[in-house]
């Protein structure tokens, strides 16, 4: 079957909006559809081909109003999908949610009267609420407690391994086991000051992306169909981590059948915490922990201090989604049906920036897109978390836990960047059953890994913000490493840094520094 026929068939399948019944359909051996997206860095210049995880369609028009009737949704008619641009993104790694901030902490930006002219998305509350969406999942949707996932059967060659890195604090910790202490790694000196960003925010048009995200809802950014893996809390930890690898996902919502609700997320961070806590323990062997159930893990290590799952409604704005992701230091934001409580979709930094990148070409271009990274000072340049290539893997785990970051630039003795070690590299220790060899140095681990990971994509201080955004979206990565001409590390520009600058800073909100 041709790709176009598969995509058409996908839109006709009932129940795809809820995300419970469908997995992403893609012909064997073929990647995501390419899409022509105008470059932010060269207005009116030639278009470049992108390997996009979002299906944009033939025309680049504004996302239509998010209006669908109950009848249309129940019959699986996806013709009125808000923007018709979306294909399920490759699933990314995410840290577990932190404490929910609650409605009182949601940011409210003042209108300046300089809003860009674009159509508003009708809130679902005024159109068709999602009450008709399927109720919480059935047995076939959830991996039951007796489900087994074999590492030898795990096929991970297709995984998208981009992981967001923010050197300030990239991930919250649901389990609450992280203690702040100095990381045993070198840290470059400050090389770039923050110079012109505050001035740019005072110029007309600086709030165009902020207003755009305020006027569109999470429903607009939801995939037509998506792959969603859900774990029952009675599943054994070992089987759960193997299932993450086997299904090519980095996080899964946790369903508590006793409470009949979602109670959290299981992520690669949890696997790192298990290794970090018990690798050197003289009392407990790691294989004993493998037999624990997820429920037991949560009860023992949360010690009754359960934090609410950070989530968002499809009626909420994309502005609120950006704020929730950055404020709570999480990588995945579940979109929950406000009536049934079912998980409809999971939003990520990468998906939100892709949405903004596609339709941002139809908006007036702010002048700050033409300014250089060095002038604007967007990114992290102080106290960077890095790891020496000669350091053992256990040292990298220490840094992941202590600094709460999701990827580490790997440097040699002279400070040159030679690689990137991410949290997702750690989960493959489970897939290869080599997590008892954490004394191997990071450089050797990078040479032995079987997958072609995201790699080290870099930028230089003289490049403009528009060029940096184009490269991140085109390469589908979560950060660019800022280097000089000799490949010495200067800083890191992450998705959080960019979304903070484009969406939150114009509203006077600093979620990264909060």
From Swiss-Prot:
Annotated GO CC locations: cytoplasm; cytosol; nucleotide-activated protein kinase complex; nucleus
Residues that coordinate or bind AMP 1: 265-270, 310, 331-332
Binding site for AMP 3: 331, 380, 385, 406-407, 478, 494-497
One GO MF term: protein kinase binding
Domain CBS, residue spans: 222-283, 305-363, 380-440, 452-511
Compositionally biased region (Polar residues): 59-71
Disease per UniProt entry: Defects in PRKAG3 are the cause of the RN- phenotype which is associated with excess glycogen content (about 70%) in skeletal muscle. This mutation originated in the hampshire breed pigs and has beneficial effects on meat content but detrimental effects on processing yield.
Name of the protein in its database record: 5'-AMP-activated protein kinase subunit gamma-3
Protein source organism: Sus scrofa (Pig)
